[in-house]
Amino acid sequence: MNYILETLNLSKKSGNTYRVKELSMQVPVGSVYGFLGPNGAGKSTTLKMILGLIHPDSGEIKVFNQKLNSSNKLSILGQTGSLIENPGGYGHLTGLENMQIIQKLKGVNEDEIERSLKTVRLFEQRDKKLKNYSLGMKQRLGIARALLGCPKLLILDEPTNGLDPAGIHEIRELISSLPKERGITVIISSHLLSEVEQMADYVGIINKGKMLYQGTLAELETKGEGLEDAFLKLTGGKESL
């Protein structure tokens, strides 16, 4: 199997406490990979290490079959889109103007703006000021910005946080469509099992910085377990279901 992302024994400490400990993950090309765990399990820390926002204490990261290092980080991350934490943006500017800022920073063709806005179904609202967008629309605009430059890999950290059911549905439909329509592999971190179950092909379950399970949803079913049962058994507690 071909993997677009692999980590090997990735670790990060905060003081004497491991935030991530010897974590190894493999994300297949063309998949939606659900990265699951309770709040504080180490999901965001792992994704920030993959994106070069913080440095691991030990272990290695391979993206596009290349070991991530200081000499190739910019070229590799240039093919990676991400939305970590809040989507941000300038409320007094339109959706289009917010996109143009990122387009110029990335140095990509302006045609990419239209394509990305159409992918997230915001093209018709491009001239509306960002402050008048719903939270779901702001999340979709954040994903549109991440899609500029045609990334091979898209990393989304809790993209449905704070959304109402309609907004969650919009994001779920969008994420599910990206591998087929754009050829993009998606990693989505979440603690909402029911949402990930409707989007993901593969899942990794993490708790206290350690990877506890990694594989397909189908493999869990062959063991007589659903995602919820496996999650509760592995993490030892009830989460958002």
Regions found by a protein language model. Give the residues of each.
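Catalytic Walker B motif of ABC-type/P-loop ATPase nucleotide-binding domains
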Residues: 154-158
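Helical segment within the ABC ATPase nucleotide-binding domain
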Residues: 169-182
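Helix-to-loop junction immediately C-terminal to a conserved catalytic motif
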Residues: 51
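Conserved ABC transporter NBD signature motif
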Residues: 59-70, 75-76
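Conserved ABC ATPase "signature" region
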Residues: 100, 104, 110-126
